[in-house]
């Protein structure tokens, strides 16, 4: 009996080794198509940007840059590129897909292109098991669904790490690829990749000959060529905002330091890895692989991955400000370190897939969180099921007979945020100027006479917004009413100037469209 059990175990190990060692194109193509099908399904059931993150801000910024580019307004384009809080490189990545239309969907198509690039990298370097574990991380498949820099960050980190895997900096072309990956990555998101890709070259530089140092200088020059102009402006404009957050912690949109009650902040990123970034099963397996790598004799490629992970984790742990997004790129080197104990892969992948069904599809809620809230505070939602919302946008826009020039938008709904509604209106009428009552009260007052259409998401029984209702929204967005022009009064008193051309129930409220009377 014992011999039979050993034989069955050996057969299982052999089958597992064979399956996860296969590096066939068919494996990658099938996995890629399944991932894309799920991506399309999820987006079809989730019509609004992610309400937990800054996605709507990134979408708006991308639209602004694209509109100025198409209009040939070089001065405005340059101003937007070099005065924005986020690097403009991230928005430029989506310019090819925006050729098919200025829409949220076109921006998200960029992530599909990056996903294809990741598949190619893992295929070329024969890492099928690492790719599968990587895709099962909530921090990865959640970031893939949003137009935010996190997924692009992971892509460029993978490009840089794979460039260092075989010869390190001994090959000048690979050193140049590393430098460009770091430079473009820094233009995708603020500074994040610096703490991952820069330490990754330490094993290559240790006792290295002069030629390696020359190649390193070439890589650094490529990085500076990509980043110097933007970061000069960035530090001049935002250094006063950055320094307090390093020492004091998170500061909200009202300028107030957020109180975070975490009894063990030193373990925040470790617990976040197991909770929301990789999940308990895949995350535990990754940490076991990390320990095994540290315990055993290491080659230069493994040292590179360790230096791409450990210094960054230490740096962000020492920072007072904590965010799970900062260490999301760490999932790349952790996945690439998963080369031992292959016999456990079927169980880990199976449990990781069950976790994916909960967070990625909403089939169940068991295991969506693993730790007490205080242990992972501040907790960020990195992945979630689709909202299944339905908004009658197409029916509403179909009632517009003449092309609008100035559109005012107001949302008093907790589900359909005004920023989301503005983006949808901009998609439908790309040549119109769209303003929000709450997001741009000063501009709304200044151009109020030019407004020809008014979109309002209100309560189920309302027929027109009231002064009190608008003021409540402004106060909720941290405005001081005595410092604002009379936008609430202007909108509330303008009912006689508009006629309603569309009204329909929408989720928990009613969506209205008004046009100015002739």
Model-derived features with residue positions:
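Membrane-interface alpha helices of multi-pass inner-membrane proteins
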Residues: 174-190, 201, 225, 310-317
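Membrane-embedded, lumen/periplasm-facing catalytic core of multi-pass transferases
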Residues: 350-414
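Signature aromatic-anchored transmembrane alpha helix within multi-pass, membrane-resident enzymes
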Residues: 25, 29, 132, 176, ...
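Transmembrane-helix motifs of polytopic, lipid-linked glycan transferases
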Residues: 105-128, 159, 288-294
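Membrane-proximal lumenal/periplasmic loop motifs of glycosylation machinery
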Residues: 45-56, 69-91, 99, 253-258, ...
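Transmembrane-lumen/periplasm boundary regions of multi-pass, lipid-linked membrane glycan transferases
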Residues: 61, 196-197, 203-297, 313, ...
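Loop-to-helix entry region of an early transmembrane alpha helix in multi-pass inner-membrane enzymes
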Residues: 78, 84, 88-95, 99-117, ...
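Short acidic/glycine- and proline-prone juxtamembrane loop motifs at membrane-interface regions
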Residues: 142-153, 323-324
């Amino acid at each position: 009996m014992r011999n039979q059990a050993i034989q069955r175990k050996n057969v299982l190990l052999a089958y597992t080794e064979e399956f996860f060692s296969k590096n066939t194109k068919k494996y990658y193509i099938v996995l890629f198509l399944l991932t894309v099908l799920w991506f399309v399904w999820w987006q079809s059931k989730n019509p609004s940007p992610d309400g937990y993150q800054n996605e709507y801000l990134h979408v708006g910024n991308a639209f602004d840059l694209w509109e100025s580019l198409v209009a040939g307004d070089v001065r405005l384009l340059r101003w937007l590129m070099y005065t924005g809080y986020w690097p403009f490189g991230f928005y430029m990545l989506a310019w090819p897909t925006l050729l098919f239309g200025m829409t949220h969907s076109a921006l998200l198509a960029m992530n599909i292109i990056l996903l294809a690039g990741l598949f190619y990298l893992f295929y070329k370097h024969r890492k099928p098991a690492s790719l599968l574990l990587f895709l099962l991380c909530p921090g990865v498949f959640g970031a893939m669904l949003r137009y935010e820099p996190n997924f692009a960050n992971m892509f460029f980190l993978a490009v840089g790490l794979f460039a260092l895997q075989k010869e390190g900096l001994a090959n000048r072309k690979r050193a140049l690829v590393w430098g460009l990956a770091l430079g473009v990555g820094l233009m995708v998101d603020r500074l994040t990749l610096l703490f991952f890709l820069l330490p990754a070259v330490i094993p290559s530089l240790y006792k290295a000959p002069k030629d390696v140092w020359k190649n390193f200088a070439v890589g650094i020059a490529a990085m500076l060529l990509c980043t110097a102009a933007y970061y000069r402006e960035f530090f001049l404009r935002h250094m006063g905002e950055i320094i307090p957050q390093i020492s004091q912690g998170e500061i909200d949109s009202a300028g107030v330091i957020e109180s975070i009650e975490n009894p063990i902040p030193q373990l925040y990123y470790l617990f976040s890895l197991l909770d929301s970034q990789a999940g308990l099963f895949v995350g535990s397996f990754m940490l076991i692989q990390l320990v095994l790598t540290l315990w055993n004799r290491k080659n230069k490629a493994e040292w590179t991955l360790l230096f791409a992970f450990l210094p960054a984790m230490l740096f962000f742990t020492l920072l007072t400000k904590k965010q799970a997004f900062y260490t999301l790129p760490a999932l790349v080197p952790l996945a690439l370190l998963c080369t031992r104990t292959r016999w456990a892969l079927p169980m880990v992948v199976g449990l990781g897939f069950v976790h994916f069904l909960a967070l990625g599809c909403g089939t169940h809620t068991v295991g969506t969180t693993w730790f007490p809230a205080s242990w992972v505070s501040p907790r960020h939602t990195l992945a979630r099921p689709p909202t299944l919302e339905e908004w009658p946008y197409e029916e509403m826009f179909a009632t517009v007979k003449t092309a609008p020039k100035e559109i005012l938008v107001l949302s008093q709904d907790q589900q359909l945020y005004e920023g989301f509604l503005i983006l949808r209106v901009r998609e439908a009428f790309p040549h119109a100027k769209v303003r929000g009552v709450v997001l741009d009260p000063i501009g709304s007052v200044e151009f109020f006479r030019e407004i020809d259409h008014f979109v309002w998401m209100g309560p189920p029984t309302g027929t027109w917004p009231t002064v009190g209702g608008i003021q409540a929204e402004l106060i909720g967005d941290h405005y001081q009413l005595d410092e604002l022009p009379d936008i609430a009064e202007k909108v509330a008193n303008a009912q006689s100037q508009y006629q309603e051309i569309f009204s329909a129930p929408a989720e928990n409220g009613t969506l209205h469209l008004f046009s100015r009377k002739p």
